[in-house]
Amino acid sequence: MATSTTRPPTGEERDQRPLDIQAMRAGAHRLLAEDPKPSVEELGTVALRLREHIVLAVPEVEEMAGRLPHDDTRRACARACIGEARMRMRLKPGATPAARIARAQRLARSVNALCDHYENLDGS
């Protein structure tokens, strides 16, 4: 099993490169659309890319949510989304192709949700 050595970007790197929301959503959409699903050979690469999107998005959303008041609903929702995304990152790939697709789809849903929070918290 391959492990990811992707590190979260530093604050300086985040300031220099904003998230590419369109690319992140396109990658997520590929797994959430009805057909065609990626082949078993492609699935590992697709899942890795989704994980990388989450690694990039979590610190951004976390930082924006942290600027909101502690009792703000948007802050609580964003933090719940971050927790869910981190939990999904810890899931191991299943033994069957269907289980692997289901895991990747969960990652894709987290990517979409993080994109939503990024846009909503940024005011775009």
Protein language model regions, located:
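Short terminal alpha-helical segments
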Residues: 2-46
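Short intrinsically disordered terminal tails
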Residues: 1-5, 121-124
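General structural signal for alpha-helix termini and helix-helix connectors
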Residues: 33-37, 63-70, 87, 91-95
